[in-house]
Each structure stands twice: as structure tokens, then as C-alpha cells.
Amino acid sequence: MSRDSQPVTITGIGSVSPYGPLAGLMANAPLEPTTISAWATAGQRRAFLVPPFRPAAVVPGLKTRRLDRLSAWALVASSLAFKDAGIDLAQLDRSRVAVVFATAFGCIELTEAFYLSAAANGWHGTDPITFPETLASAPASHVAMFHGLRGPNVTVSNKYFAGESAILQAACIVRQGQADLAIVLAGEALARTLYEWYEQAHLLSPACYDANSQEAAGFIPSEGVAALVLESSTRMQERPEARNYARIISGRWAAGGHAAEIIRKMLSGSGPRLAICSSNGEPCAVSSTSSLVREVAGDDCVIAPPQAFARGLAGTGALFHFMLALSKRAGSPHGSELALMLGTTRDNGFAALLLELP
């Protein structure tokens, strides 16, 4: 996605997270993991969990009885994002509204239940109604059906950069005229099998087991769904009252290669003053992200490190990294500036977005 195309603007934010269901930015407040009680554990196990709530109390008329929590959260987060953007879908051509969803594990709770039922009862003993909900694209389908959206519908998955990939995909869809606006969602729900897999892979922080332990290597698993509304420049001209959280200027994603060289070309001489670290699973300070920021943006670029909650969302934390960085930025005086949102992997892979913040 190059700088030659018209920018796409982020005009609405919604989320379901350990902070609860929210429209707009989350509070810039400390967040502590809670003890898992949804399943039996051998000793204390902690994670950043979404507190129980009734989706219909947030979005009147919403029915979620047969849905996985991930799909229910996607419906709530998308509704809150549209509300925050001030968009009345009844006034739009809904065939021009795209849905892009990012997930690493999909509807893991119903998938877990389906396969455990098959293991216990055989394939003939499984519930056929449950099977469609095991598809990773189920949340995006539910969002489209609930809101009556008939534009492009895409689900992406990536080990490291699913969230960034979703933003890039949605921005390209809007820029290429395939849609006038897009709702971008990313997130995960925690289940016993996923948490235990993290343990077996030795990926977890000591803080998962001891509240007094300092977080070091590893991460604390998280759950939640974030949603962003992206609008075209044409629509923004028709909506002067629309909120502007950020303009997406350009972006790149690569599985390898010379990251610094590619990002410099993307920046085209621009000097971002803020870097939003979107590294997942490890602290920004000990990842390659900080050194790459210094290489392409210099020592004067302020690095906004990710919060532990966003790092625990596998590859889908990018939207929360962005939202939490904006929340922190809102508490201090500032002017318009360029920001580089950057995530890296150990094998030279990276995802980068150049943003203009108001």
C-alpha cells in the first residue's frame, strides 16, 4: 500500500476487552490479569480476561445464544465502532461496506467442544449445528448478517501480523474503490486447550502463575475483540463532523528481506516522531522492533511500548496496540504528527503502518 493513493481515515473505535465493552478509546489505566475460574487448573493460572456481560444489554436486540464468545464480541465491538463513528447504516448502500476480520485461532471454544464431543462420542455423536461455528470466518459472517453488510468479506490469519494484515487489507479495499468504508476487527477468546498449549510450548510468563512475579520472558494470554471503522477520503469530505483518530498513509508487510530498506522507502523521507510498538508475545525493549525503529526513524522518535494485555493476543493485538497508544497520547499535549506502527519477528519479518495522527 503506497503513499500515492488517497489516505484512509479511522473514524470509529469499538472494543470488548478486559476493560469491558467500550465505544471509543479505553482509559489509560493499569490492568491486572485475573485468576482463571472457567476451568479447573493445577494451581493458580492468570490471564487478561473479558469480564462477563450481557451483549443484549450493550446492543439491544442482539441474540447470541448459539454463538461462540468471539462471534458475540465481534457483533458488540462492531456495533460500538459504528456508533462511535456516528454512522447510520440505514442511510448507506450496505453493498459498499466491507468486513475484514483477523484471528489466529477462530472460534476456539466451539471448536474445542466439537472435537471433544467427537473424541467422546464419535463423529456421529457430534452436533451438526455447531460445526459451521468452528470456521474461522464465522465472526465476520455474523457481523455481515447482523448489520446487513453485503460488501467484501475477508478473514485473515497470520502467526505474527494478523491485525496489521487486516488493516492493510481493509485500507486497500477502500482505496481501490471496492467499498466506501470498512469495519476491521481482530481478536481471540481464551479456552483451556489454548492456554495449555501455550504452557506446553513454554511461552508463558512467570506472572501467569504468581501475582508477585515480575513479568520477564514470555507473555500473559489475553482475550478480546477490537474494531475500527475505516472511511474513504470521499466520504470524509461528505462528513466534516466525522472524528479523525488517524489517517493511514501507507503500509508494508513482509515475511523477510531487508526491513530497514523497505520501511525507508515507505517513509519517503518522512520522519515519524512516534513509534507504536506492536510486537506480540515479548517486550518491545528486548525485541528487534526498537532497534529497527532507531535505524529508520532515529533516536528522537518516541517509542510507545505495548501493554502486556495487547501482547497476549498472539498475532491479533495490533488494533489494541493502536488504541492503547492513542489512549496514552490523549493524556498529554501534542500536535499533528506522523507515527510508525511497527511489529517484527526474529526471522526479519515485519509489518509497518505509517499513520498521521491529529
Q: Where are each of the predicted segments found?
A:
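Conserved "HGTGT" condensation-loop signature of ketosynthase/thiolase-family condensing enzymes
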Residues: 1-152, 164, 172-176, 187, ...
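Short, well-structured beta-strand segments enriched in hydrophobic/aromatic residues
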Residues: 181-185
